[in-house]
């Protein structure tokens, strides 16, 4: 007995086999005491089932109030409503369950759709929508006072939560372009076009952005989607029609471009008429194109773009004095525009005019250094004349001024290095730019252009094995723009890699069999370079089946086919007769 009393757990009068129980935690747990030492805890499920709704209600109210306090006072969102906060938690749970079997993109689209239908309702989506509107207002106020850090902080979330707010989408897309995230920007603009069917300015911004980064395929797809939509305003329809026709022209699909011009009567406008003239010019019918352009200038005397095109064509034809007259007229008509000044550089060729060109370049940079397109045109002039110092200077200027299209300046500079014969520097610069691409977004066309230039640089630098591997990768990519392949072939010819150049031309035609511009350029390259002209007849026949080649091309082909090289070629005489017939 004395031993038991010494035990600290001993309870006087309670034996080791005695049992008793008592509830704790509001009766949800029962404690069963066996003897004076052993205690067993077991849940009381009936009591738990009875009290759990009460606890869940208390928890829901507490979390809702905490969330309301956080959003309303800590995050400073004055549009926060207590009713939304009380529905926020149940909506979140329901969303989580509904999204279990959905992918990331499906969840994003589902959430976006809900935000479009909750303007006058309550709950999680309604709160997020109101929160987005508030963030957009904060971002716009920050932009007005030039607080760009705060603007960038709020506009992204604001635009995401208000998908139908076109101004927010535009501002956020501009920010994405500025931060070198064009893919995100295009996605944002394209998803919001459905709300801009009566807003021509919004569509025009999208069209301009597509042309800025050579997104012809993207623009053609968008035009196909909205041209048949009766809800789209006539003004937007007209813009999409001419934009799609121009995109087809830039891709070399002359037949499709002419089809759109005829279908929508685009040649009744100055832009459409000019486009038809451009197609004739690029097809080789240059005298007819120039005559039609002169007729257009008589009909549209205020057509600045018509006069600009005439100056460019006269320059290409070698009529520099007449081109200068056109530029003088442009300078008088548009004294504040950079075009005439920059175009005048092309009229000062050769080393004797180097100092005059340098003076014009300095003047252009000093006067128009903040205009991105003007500086890009100036960089392209530097590329055509292989002035590496000029393209490098403008690439640095683009970084300093934080131009939206900075990567295009880098691309022009890389091509200029290659044109100047500095292949090793080209490779090193592209490798360095690829490190930058890990931070920025590049559209696929830009990446493929860099790949093509680096591939050619490997050949020019004597690294033929690496060049061959990269060339095979490039040609296996079915999405490479045709002009990238044609340009690559030209540069391979300059590097005297004729076999590789011919392989690229073959691939360019296989990937773009209906492309008249590609076929015409292939024929012209084969006429100019006998080393790749073994299959000239094949491509010439295909070109003649698609459209009538220019007189100059036919005459050059006639001379080439009359040479001894094609003496034993099959059907040579038939082809010669066909060419002579077209020349009559």
Task: Give each language-model segment a name.
Residues 89, 96, 100-111, 121-161, ...:
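Alpha-helical segment of the N-proximal tetratricopeptide repeat
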Residues 117-134, 230-236, 365, 440-446, ...:
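TPR-adjacent "capping" and linker segments in tetratricopeptide-repeat scaffold/adaptor proteins
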Residues 142, 176, 210, 248, ...:
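Residue at a conserved register position within TPR or TPR-like alpha-solenoid repeats
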Residues 152-156, 183-194, 216-231, 253-265, ...:
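Alpha-helical repeat scaffolds
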């Amino acid at each position: 007995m004395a031993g038991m009393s010494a035990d600290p757990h001993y309870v006087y009068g309670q034996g080791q086999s005695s049992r008793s129980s008592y509830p704790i935690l509001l009766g949800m747990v029962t404690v069963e005491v066996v003897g004076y030492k052993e205690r067993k805890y077991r849940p009381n499920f009936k009591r738990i089932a009875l009290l759990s709704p009460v606890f869940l209600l208390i928890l829901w109210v507490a979390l809702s109030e905490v969330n309301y306090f956080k959003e309303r006072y800590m995050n400073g969102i004055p549009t926060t409503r207590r009713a939304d906060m009380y529905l926020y938690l149940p909506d979140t749970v329901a969303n989580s369950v509904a999204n279990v079997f959905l992918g990331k993109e499906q969840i994003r689209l589902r959430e976006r759709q809900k935000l479009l239908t909750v303007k006058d309702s309550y709950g999680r989506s309604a709160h997020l929508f109101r929160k987005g509107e508030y963030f957009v207002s904060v971002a716009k106020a920050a932009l007005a006072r030039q607080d760009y850090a705060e603007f960038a902080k709020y506009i992204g979330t604001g635009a995401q939560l208000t998908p139908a707010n076109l101004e927010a989408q535009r501002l956020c897309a501009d920010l994405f372009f500025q931060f070198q995230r064009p893919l995100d920007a295009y996605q944002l603009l394209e998803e919001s076009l459905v709300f801009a069917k009566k807003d021509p300015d919004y569509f025009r911004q999208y069209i301009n952005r597509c042309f800025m980064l050579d997104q012809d395929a993207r623009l053609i797809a968008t035009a196909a989607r909205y041209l048949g939509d009766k809800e789209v305003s006539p003004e937007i329809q007209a813009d999409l029609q001419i934009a799609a026709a121009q995109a087809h022209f830039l891709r070399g699909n002359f037949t499709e471009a002419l089809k759109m011009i005829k279908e929508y009567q685009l040649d009744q406008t100055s832009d459409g008429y000019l486009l038809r003239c451009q197609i004739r010019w690029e097809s080789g019918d240059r005298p007819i194109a120039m005559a039609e352009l002169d007729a257009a200038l008589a009909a549209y005397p205020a057509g600045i773009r018509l006069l600009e095109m005439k100056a460019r064509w006269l320059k290409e034809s070698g009529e520099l004095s007449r081109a200068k007259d056109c530029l003088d007229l442009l300078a008088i008509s548009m004294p504040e525009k950079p075009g005439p000044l920059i175009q005048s550089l092309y009229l000062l060729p050769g080393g004797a005019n180097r100092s005059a060109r340098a003076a014009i370049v300095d003047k252009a940079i000093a006067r128009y250094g903040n205009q991105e397109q003007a500086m890009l045109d100036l960089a392209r002039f530097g590329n055509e004349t292989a002035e590496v110092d000029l393209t490098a200077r403008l690439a640095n200027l683009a970084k300093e001024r934080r131009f939206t299209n900075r990567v295009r300046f880098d691309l022009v500079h890389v091509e200029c290095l290659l044109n100047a014969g500095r292949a090793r520097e080209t490779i090193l610069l592209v490798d360095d730019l690829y490190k930058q691409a890990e931070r920025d977004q590049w559209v696929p066309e830009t990446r493929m252009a860099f790949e093509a230039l680096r591939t050619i640089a490997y050949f020019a630098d004597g690294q033929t094995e690496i060049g061959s591997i990269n060339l095979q990768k490039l040609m296996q990519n079915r999405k490479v723009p045709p002009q990238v392949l044609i340009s690559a072939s030209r540069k391979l010819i300059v590097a005297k890699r004729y076999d590789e150049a011919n392989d690229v031309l073959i691939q360019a035609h296989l990937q773009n069999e209906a492309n008249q511009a590609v076929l015409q350029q292939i024929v012209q390259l084969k006429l100019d370079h006998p080393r790749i002209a073994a299959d000239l007849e094949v491509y010439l026949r295909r070109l003649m089946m698609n459209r009538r080649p220019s007189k100059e091309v036919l005459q050059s082909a006639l001379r080439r086919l009359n040479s001894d090289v094609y003496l034993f070629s099959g059907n040579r005489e038939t082809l010669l007769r066909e060419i002579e017939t077209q020349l009559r």
